[in-house]
Amino acid sequence: MTFPLFITLLILTATLIVMWNKLRKARRAEYIRSYSLPDGLFERLRKRRPELTLKDCQLVSHALRQFFLAYLKSGCKFVSMPSQVADDLWHEFILYTKNYDLFCKSAFGGFLHHSPAVVLSTAQQNNTGLRRCWWHTCREENINPRDPTRLPLLFALDAKLKVADGFHYVADCRSVRRKSTGNDSGGAVYCGGDFSSSSFDGGTDGFGDASSADGGGLGDGGSGCGGGGCGGGGD
């Protein structure tokens, strides 16, 4: 085999691998978007949150899909959950053990472990996961993650549904800086613009990192999604 032919075959192989990875990611994303949640899941959520209507539960399920898509699009890197009520639905979904295991294998190629909902703090791993989640949910809704004019659903959800213990966000940090929300929750307000700031832990890891590329990196072995170590820590 001549050297030019070898280089040509190498380039062709690399191109085919990239195309195959993109196709697989697209198939997995469509699977997440169209997946039918197990029967009875909303009823279990409403036992935790009796104030939720069926329409509210459907909105929560849409937000949870955003979280799963963020994990997929990150290359199956660690992502943190920003919503208390979406976290509740995620936790209830996990209790459907067989359904959740099959979902994870089909959507990610491996199991996604649960990690509790968090906000920006001094905990660097959680912050990295939140920034990564923010980046990909913004891109999902065509929002500029560096200068947002509105919030992606996953970050707006707790305030929208008036979740008493929820994490309430605003897009514009210049007008509100962790004041009382003025609603029934009486909680703090968190700012979308803070995800590009290094003031919390001295860095911006996870914000628009290399995982945000739409290329490959989703191999079941090399992506970190091939076994039991995907996502965050256990409960």
Name these PLM-found stretches.
Residues L16-G40, R44:
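Transmembrane-cytosolic junction motif
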Residues S34, L59, D235:
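Polar-ligand-bearing catalytic/cofactor-coordination segments
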